[in-house]
């Protein structure tokens, strides 16, 4: 079994490296990415677990880690159908910019930190070999860098609702699954109706109370239970992101904050290949 585990891990590393290289060679590499993560899960007592995980995300080239997620969490299985969890995540977002002072190319790199807290409740039901689940997660993310609060809040709150279906084979240690998850922004920057038309300069800021769906995520994957303690998860993840582009600036002490352009929506799509390893004890 140990040889199988080593072989599986080697295949994962090779698959991950090849996928990142493919993305790096693509002209639109920001639309593709790869994720590599590891998790340690400790069973305190029946139904009660504490876990720690680290995830690396790659976009725009194999030589650059776009961001990393360091998470510590606690989960409790209330009964056969309900599970609750809370977690804290430190997020490091790596940035780089190329400047040309005196016709000399210089690459600047820096890290922006974010702090995230979340609480979720998962309801699940088994029908034969099928398992259906719905997870509701409330999540808050605090950005450390200075922000224009008339464009976005310092602490963003979202509600993530994940609907998942999985099938567990009787004779083989594989579990294919798929899920769909919309994300509802709860406190976006809200402006008056004039912000959408020709009279945008007369729009007024109404506070952080704009509510709209700003992300849709779906994935398909295969979980491989290597043995009692070790498991691997291979998945393909599609992300559709939507946001409102707000250009608000303060002009003088009398006029206050004004919009420099009408508010409009922007969207982007990303496709990621992921490999996750989990050790339970």
Report residues per predicted region.
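Outer-membrane beta-barrel translocator/channel fold
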Residues: 60, 85-144, 148, 240, ...
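Transmembrane beta-strand segments that form the barrel wall of outer-membrane beta-barrel proteins
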Residues: 22-26, 48-62, 67, 84-92, ...
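Membrane-embedded beta-strand positions in outer-membrane beta-barrel channels/transporters
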Residues: 37, 71, 118-120, 160-164, ...
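Repeated loop/turn-to-beta-strand initiation elements of outer-membrane beta-barrel proteins
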Residues: 47-52, 81-86, 128-132, 171-175, ...
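Outer-membrane beta-barrel transmembrane domain signature
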Residues: 137-255, 279-281
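Outer-membrane beta-barrel proteins
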Residues: 44-46, 73, 78-80, 122-129, ...
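Outer-membrane beta-barrel "beta-signal"
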Residues: 121, 267-281
């Amino acid at each position: 079994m140990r040889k199988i585990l080593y072989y599986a891990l080697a295949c994962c590393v090779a698959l991950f490296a090849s996928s990142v290289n493919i993305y790096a060679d693509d002209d639109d590499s920001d639309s593709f990415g790869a994720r590599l993560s590891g998790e340690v899960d400790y069973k305190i007592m029946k139904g009660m677990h504490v876990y720690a995980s680290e995830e690396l995300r790659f976009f725009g080239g194999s030589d650059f880690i776009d961001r990393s997620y360091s998470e510590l969490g606690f989960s409790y299985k209330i009964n056969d159908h309900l599970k609750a969890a809370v977690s804290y995540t430190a997020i490091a977002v790596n940035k780089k910019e190329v400047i040309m002072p005196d016709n000399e190319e210089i690459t600047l790199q820096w890290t922006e930190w974010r702090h995230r807290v979340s609480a979720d409740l998962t309801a699940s039901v088994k029908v034969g070999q099928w398992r259906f689940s719905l997870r509701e997660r409330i999540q808050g993310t605090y950005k450390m860098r200075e922000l224009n609060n008339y464009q976005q809040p310092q602490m963003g709150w979202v509600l993530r609702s994940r609907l998942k279906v999985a099938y567990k084979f009787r004779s083989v240690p594989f579990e294919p699954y798929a899920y769909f998850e919309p994300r509802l922004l709860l406190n976006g920057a809200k402006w008056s109706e004039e912000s959408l038309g020709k009279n945008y300069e007369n729009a007024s800021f109404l506070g952080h109370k704009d509510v709209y769906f700003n992300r849709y995520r779906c994935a398909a994957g295969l979980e491989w239970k290597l043995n009692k303690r070790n498991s691997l998860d291979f998945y393909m993840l599609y992300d559709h992101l939507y946001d409102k582009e707000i250009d608000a600036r303060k002009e003088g002490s009398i006029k206050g904050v004004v919009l420099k352009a009408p508010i409009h929506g922007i969207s982007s799509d990303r496709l990621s290949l992921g490999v996750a390893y989990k050790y339970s004890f």
